[in-house]
Amino acid sequence: IPRFLGALLDYYKDPAALSADTAFTLLDAIRYLPQQYYGEKTRGALIEFAAYFVAQGELRLTIAALEFLREAQRSLPKGHPQMGRIVAIVRSMQPEALTAIFLKYKILSRAGVKDPALEQTLYHMDITSEVFLDNLKTATPWIVKVAGVELLRDQVEHGLDAHILHIAAHFSNLVKVSERVVVRHTAGDALVRTLSLLRRDQRNEVVVELGKGLEMGQYEISKYIPQYLGQAALYLHPSELDEQVLWLRGLLASPSDSAVSGALNTIGVLLENYPAYLERFPQPYSAFEHRRQELLGLLLQGLAHYREAVRQEALLVIGKLLFESRELSLGEKSRLFALCYRKLLFLILESADQSRLTFFYRAAALAHINRFIALHRLDHGPFSFPPPRKIAFFPGTFDPFTLSHKGIVQAIRDLGFEVYLAVDEFSWSKKAQPHLIRRQIVNLSVAGDFHVHLFPDDIPVNIANPDDLHRLSQLFPDQELYIVAGSDVVANASCYKAPPRPWSIHGMNHVIFRRAGEKPLPKKLPIT
């Protein structure tokens, strides 16, 4: 490091010989140079380097120099000689730009020096529209825009809330349209910090407006939105948040891969920051947990998608934003893992046909999950999973799979069953549709429903064959196994009319649902 530092500091010896672009790069670089690697003498030389460009008057260089001087102040006590030199430098300047005035005021305030004229300009005059105008100009340097965002945020934090909604909307626009990544990130952070100060209706308006950037489906616009849309949505009241979740569900059906990718990333950020929502908006834990499961289910739907690009993005989000997250505690990750580990395993294996790129996406996601599992086992020992549920087996899943069929599956699941759906290879009594397409339709339909799974394709089960039923029962040892069938099947299928044999269908537990139009039973029959 000393050799590198010495080579770098050689460039700061003659500021007059530098071009404007080189000087700006050097000024911006020293802000991020760790101060423990150089002493007071070097710091003094860098302060004089910045002083030269403060005096030059070019706004871009002035702002960069002031940002460094502000950073250098952080490690200096008020009585330090270098602190006095910094104060002398900024007092000698006569800035006209509001961003330069703002930085001058901040530097003097940190040094304990009051300047009523600067305070009058910043906090007793309406300067918001002028900052808006500068921030939206293409010709404005990005470092000036960053300082402008900080100025607007400072205005709000000082209680100047006359334009607070317009300021939040301005931050939202910068996240969507700014050509500089650093401006987008600065505006996004400022937006999230500002939302808590808005009224309920204002928060909803800003979040909805920010979400419109995802609907456009343009990657250049939507790339950085999810990181802040996900955090911002968690400042909405529960009813408005549920509307946002419903909107994201609809966006997952978009024909644009960019829009779907943005929706998946937003859902990932929502899940990553979701634990804080319960403290922000107290509510019944059941409602809080139901919303978490719904969000996780939407991610799993992405894994079951028929478009490969969507499956790739879902793998990335699950691996990186959930199991590699620095925001989620190990306990939160464990709860998510216990809920979805079966779904993850099945959905990853179900889409066996893959491109080379998908192979690497899958490898990266599994590496993140494996790292989480290893850390959990080291710190907390083996996983603790809920006790096994009763098994409900659909021997021939409906074709085509409709919402009413899905409702039957969910009703049985809600009775405490783990539901397995088997898709027939071919049945003359059903629609003659290719088997893999039928299986994919069912898979996509139930991907987001927990405790509902497709039965493995390589284990054929014929309910008329006692050997198949015996093997099926052996797949679920120490668990109650139920066959699910419609009342018309029980009344008319040949296997039920055949004489009973060992392990025939007659000796199996059943869950029977009544077909529409049939007479109701004289009394309800219990599940035994």
Language model regions located:
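Residue-level signature of the C-terminal ends
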Residues: 4-7, 11, 15, 29-40, ...
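Extended amphipathic alpha-helical coiled-coil/heptad-repeat regions
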Residues: 123, 150, 160-163, 171-243, ...
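Short sequence/structural elements of tandem HEAT/ARM alpha-solenoid repeats
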Residues: 3-6, 39-48, 78-85, 126-127, ...
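Conserved hydrophobic register position within alpha-solenoid helical repeats
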Residues: 1, 22, 26, 46, ...
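Alpha-solenoid HEAT/Armadillo-like helical repeat scaffolds in large eukaryotic proteins
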Residues: 7-15, 49-56, 88-93, 101-108, ...
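Alpha-helix N-cap/helix-start positions at coil->helix boundaries
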Residues: 17-20, 59, 95, 111-112, ...
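Generic N-terminal leader segments that precede the first folded domain
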Residues: 59, 63, 90-99, 103, ...
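Nucleotidyltransferase catalytic core that binds NTPs
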Residues: 226, 264, 268, 274-528
